[in-house]
A protein has these predicted regions:
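Hydrophobic positions on the alpha1 helix immediately C-terminal to the Walker A/P-loop
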Residues: 59
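The conserved Walker
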Residues: 51-52
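Conserved GTP-binding G-domain of TRAFAC-class P-loop NTPases and closely related GTPase folds
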Residues: 66, 70, 83, 190-254
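Conserved lysine of the Walker
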Residues: 56
């Protein structure tokens, strides 16, 4: 007489049978996986670097063919870039939304920074205040970026490149997740950067613009070494279409 199975052994047997059936169905009726590493944009991360007013977002739109030089910024109305499917990673729109909730016009940020009291500035920008508009915006962006990374979706990571160590960390993390990385460095002269900043809604002022611009310039050669062949510089002191070789290089990359 066969000895009855214990509840534990019975559970293990059922699991084994189910597993074997699953494996058998896969072998007998295999399905073609539609997604892969060769899909446009998949596992591609394009970093931008450039000081205030350099036109990084403008150039990215033109490079990937989602607008001409005369069109309005594409990234204001969408979270992806054209047929390549790259996702924009930029906290600006979230930050401006939080400013709107506070009833603050972005044009007033510089005046707020100059106030004798730091109370209002802390509400807007303080890194130590968890509920500041800037930190809330960064939180939204981090959640969105985590979602993109889990799906290994392609990303355009918009930044100034003013902090070299931060860029090294971000690139290393992307590399570890299997991403191929590229940097688009957008260059302008300091006078042009200051002039353009003065015309922006969120002006930084000449002193801060010069500080950031210099930090970015100091990192330029190091970025070139860090990214190797996947590094392109566009001189954008005069607005215009980027060189065709840059457009071709980036589109071939993604």
């Amino acid at each position: 007489m066969t000895k009855p199975l214990s509840s534990v052994n019975l559970h293990q047997l059922v699991q084994q049978v189910i597993t074997e059936q699953r494996h058998s169905s896969i072998l007998c009726a295999p399905k073609v996986i539609q997604e892969g590493v060769y899909d446009p944009g998949i596992l591609k991360a394009v970093f931008t670097a450039g000081g205030p007013g350099s036109g990084k977002s403008y150039l990215a739109d033109v490079v990937f063919g989602v607008r001409t030089a005369k069109d309005k910024p594409f990234f204001e109305n969408a979270s992806f870039i054209g047929s390549n499917g790259l996702k924009y990673v930029n906290s600006d729109r979230f930050f401006e939304r939080e400013l709107g909730k506070l009833g603050i016009n972005p044009k007033d940020l510089r005046d707020i920074a100059d106030l004798p009291s730091d109370e209002l500035w802390d509400i807007v920008q303080s890194a130590d205040e968890p509920e500041s508009a800037r930190n809330v915006a960064k939180g939204y962006l981090e959640s969105l970026r985590n979602l993109y990374e889990k799906g290994r979706l392609g990303m355009l990571i918009d930044g100034t490149g003013g902090k070299y160590d931060k860029m090294v960390r971000e690139k290393s993390l992307a590399d570890a997740m299997g991403y191929d990385t590229y940097m688009l460095f957008v260059d302008t002269s300091l006078p042009v950067a200051i002039e353009r900043d003065a015309k922006r809604d969120r002006t930084l002022g000449p002193q801060l613009v010069e500080e950031i611009w210099q930090n970015v310039q100091d990192n330029k050669e190091r970025f070139k070494e860090l990214f190797g062949d996947n590094f392109a510089v566009v001189e954008n002191s005069v607005y215009g279409p980027p060189p065709q070789e840059v457009i071709k290089s980036l589109n071939n990359f993604v």
